[in-house]
Structure formats: C-alpha cells, structure tokens
C-alpha cells in the first residue's frame, strides 16, 4: 500500500496541471494513476461555452459509446402488451407496469436505467420524486421515453451514456474503465465529443469546447489538448 501511495504521489508530481497533454498521453497518465483495487472508471469533464442559466442553452442527450462502458447495465422497462414482450426479447432485466411502480415505491430498485413507452408515463409520472433525484426518470430527450422499446433497450445495454450540463456549463461523463486500452478510451471520447457538437445550442456563441480534462475515480485530473483528439 505504501508503494502504491508513493507511486501515485510521484505520478501527481510528474503531471503539469497547467499543460494540455496530447489525448493519448493524457489517457495513459490517467490509466497509470488508477491504482485502486477495483477497476476505476475513466471520466471526462468538458467545459462548454454555454450560459447554463438559459434554458435554450441546456445541452442534454445520450450517446452509445462504441466500446461500451465496461459494466453490465440492468434495464427496467415500463410497458404493457406487445411492447412488454418486445422489451423482454430485447434483453430487458425487469418489465412491468403498475406492479413495477409498486415495487419502486417499496424501495425495490435493482436497475441502472429506466425506460418507458409513452403510454406508460401516466404511471411513471407518479414516481418523479423517487426516480428524479437518482437520475433515473425517463425522458424523451435521452431516448428513455420511446415507442421503440427494442431500440431503447438495446442502446442502454450497448453502453449508452447520458450527458447534461451542470450549473457551471460542464458535462461530466464516464467513457470507460481503467482496464480499457487507450485506443478504446479515445474512441469513446471522440464519440462523446461528436454528440456534444451535434447538440450545440444555436444560441451558443464563441468557443464551444472551452476545456477538456480526463481523470480516474481515485486518480488525478489531466487536461487534454483538444486538437489532438481528432488526430
């Protein structure tokens, strides 16, 4: 343990916090700093040139990362009839309607993503105070309220991540695990940045991508030279 702490301390001293590193170097440094006993997540923070106080400059959506996120995602679906069977066939872990709502009210929430068909929102709407604070409330903007229940389930299972600007105009998102290769992490990062570019508000002026940094769960943050990401 002492050797790990010493190694991490040396790595932190090696990183220049004021420097923008080429993306491959930045990701390698972050991987090297992930010395915890578990497979740490690799996260990105993107400072966007938006005014988060204005509703028309909110950046929110979802993207399927090509290399996944390195974890098994449990999906719960609110649907009935044919859609319920389609959800099961697509790989949903939990499918229900009023019974699923009752389970959630009772505290049974063994899932990571909640999907609902549009007609189910009359039931799901009653769960806002439970699902909302946990970031689980279905929303059409991120594809979790959809008539295409098969596509929604498959996207969630394939490693879809949701993104949303916080009060400071920053998007925080996981792009993989420390066990991922640098190439796979870069591919996921590029997919996220492409999605953010497509979601750029028309009212956003000036520089859109202001700053980009990557970090691991327990490690250090490293700033990335944005010009190197597309290289």
From Swiss-Prot:
InterPro entries per UniProt: Ribosom_uL1_bac-type (IPR005878), Ribosomal_uL1 (IPR002143), Ribosomal_uL1-like (IPR023674), Ribosomal_uL1/biogenesis (IPR028364), Ribosomal_uL1_3-a/b-sand (IPR016095), Ribosomal_uL1_CS (IPR023673)
Pfam families: Ribosomal_L1 (PF00687)
Keywords linked to the UniProt accession: Repressor, Ribonucleoprotein, Ribosomal protein, RNA-binding, rRNA-binding, Translation regulation, tRNA-binding
Cellular component terms per the entry's GO annotation: cytosolic large ribosomal subunit
GO BP: regulation of translation; translation
GO MF, any single term: structural constituent of ribosome
HAMAP family the UniProt entry points to: Ribosomal_uL1_B
Similarity remark: Belongs to the universal ribosomal protein uL1 family.
Biological role stated in the UniProt entry: Binds directly to 23S rRNA. The L1 stalk is quite mobile in the ribosome, and is involved in E site tRNA release. Protein L1 is also a translational repressor protein, it controls the translation of the L11 operon by binding to its mRNA.
Quaternary structure and partners: Part of the 50S ribosomal subunit.
Record-given protein name: Large ribosomal subunit protein uL1
Organism of derivation: Thiobacillus denitrificans (strain ATCC 25259 / T1)
